[in-house]
Design a protein with these regions (language model features):
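Phosphate- and other anionic-substrate recognition elements at nucleic-acid/protein interfaces
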Residues: 1-156
Length: 156
């Protein structure tokens, strides 16, 4: 079986897993919001271990943003390093993908509402809400799902 993972490592980021479920390919989508605890990420990735799985991961490669403070840059770097550590430890092959590269694939810019619109078009049955109580679609879920789709298109 094949699984394609997309990770938006930001503070409001997410991990998305597209799992091939049938032939012709149909995909199950799993979205996990970022939390202070990496356990949900680890469990999602560990469930795809073993010789019967082919896993490919696209990790968004972003740097410091203009105007960010030292503390927020440090926190982002910490999270980014933790995610790379988890992927490396679990032997999940991953590619660092700059936002401009994966966004070009979908014909979008940095406007988060565009990301959500493209996600809804590609995955009309997937909820992008962070929690059931949310009213607004989550751009972290959208970015992670688009990264997973980018991985599927390039490594599928």
């Amino acid at each position: 079986m094949k699984a394609f993972v997309g990770i938006d490592p930001g503070v409001k980021g997410s991990l998305a897993v597209l799992t091939e479920t049938a032939t012709p390919p149909m995909y199950h989508v799993e979205l996990i919001p970022w939390a202070d605890d990496l356990a949900p990420y680890i469990e999602a990735l560990k469930s795809k271990e073993g010789p019967s799985w082919q896993v490919s991961c696209a990790l968004e490669h972003v740097g410091a943003m203009p105007g960010q403070g030292v503390k927020s840059m440090f926190n982002f770097g910490k999270v980014f390093g933790e995610v790379i550590g988890v992927l490396t430890t679990l032997k999940v092959p991953f590619e660092l993908v700059r936002p401009q590269r994966w966004q070009k694939e979908f014909g979008i810019s940095g406007d988060k509402s565009e990301h959500i619109a493209v996600c809804k078009r590609l995955f009309p049955n997937v909820s992008l809400l962070r929690t059931p109580r949310c009213r607004k679609d989550d751009d972290g879920h959208a970015d992670a799902l688009l990264l997973a789709e980018w991985s599927r298109r390039h490594h599928g």
